[in-house]
Regions:
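Glycine-rich anion/phosphate-binding loop at the beta-strand->alpha-helix junction
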Residues: 51
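Extracytosolic ligand-binding ectodomains
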Residues: 9-22, 26-32, 39-48, 60-69, ...
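Short, small-residue-biased leader/transition segments that mark boundaries at the very start
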Residues: 1-6
Length: 196
């Protein structure tokens, strides 16, 4: 649910009435299922696609079908040169350099890591050159605030898609809450699968 929360809240910041549809592949990597999911969403009328899977199938299908896409993990500019409007990219290089140095210094310890903008581990890149300058400035401004921990997308109030306040005003979801998030936020259609 936390990935959907981020995407939906971002979309709602510019269009409060946005609706987000989800199709589950239940796997990190299955290009066939990813193509099917993409075509299902396009068939439902979705006008911008994104994914949380590991292949290039979603951007490739979006490119071939003429639908805008935000890629995940890497920019995939060669896969969707006309339809890519941006990419959520992951950068572990600085983190690994820090961890390796800690090992050399005898200071390494096992600990969970939820690295985001403040650690430069998650970035928005490959923003389409067609984006208005004001939009790019807004994106850069929000990211800068995230780097400085002046803005957190998981700050309340966060209301789920059934109208229940999950994170009240003035509160911020901690790692435990994010790791156990079993709801979608307002605007997302559907429910998080329970695995039953």
């Amino acid at each position: 649910g936390s990935e959907m929360c981020i995407r939906d809240r971002g979309a709602q910041s510019v269009n409060p009435d946005v609706k987000v549809s989800v199709v589950w592949t239940n796997t990190w990597y299955d290009p066939g299922k990813e193509v099917d999911a993409t075509n299902t969403l396009i068939g439902q009328g979705c006008d911008i696609l994104t994914h949380h899977t590991d292949s290039t199938a979603v951007p490739a299908t979006a490119e071939s079908r003429g639908v805008k896409v935000i890629s995940y993990h890497s920019a995939m500019t060669k896969t969707a040169p006309k339809q890519l409007i941006g990419a959520v990219t992951h950068h572990w290089d600085e983190y690994y350099a820090h961890r390796i140095q800690a090992l050399y210094d005898g200071k390494w310890k096992v600990e969970p890591v939820w690295g985001g903008a403040e650690m430069h581990m998650v970035r928005l890149s490959a923003i389409t050159p067609d984006a208005p300058k004001s939009v790019v400035e807004d994106i850069n401004s929000v990211y800068s605030k995230m780097e400085k921990k002046e803005f957190n997308v998981f700050s309340g109030p966060i209301v789920d898609n059934e109208g229940k306040v999950q994170i009240p005003e003035g509160k911020v979801a901690d790692d435990k809450m994010l790791n156990t998030m079993n709801y979608f936020v307002k605007g997302v259609i559907g429910k998080v699968p329970t695995g039953k």
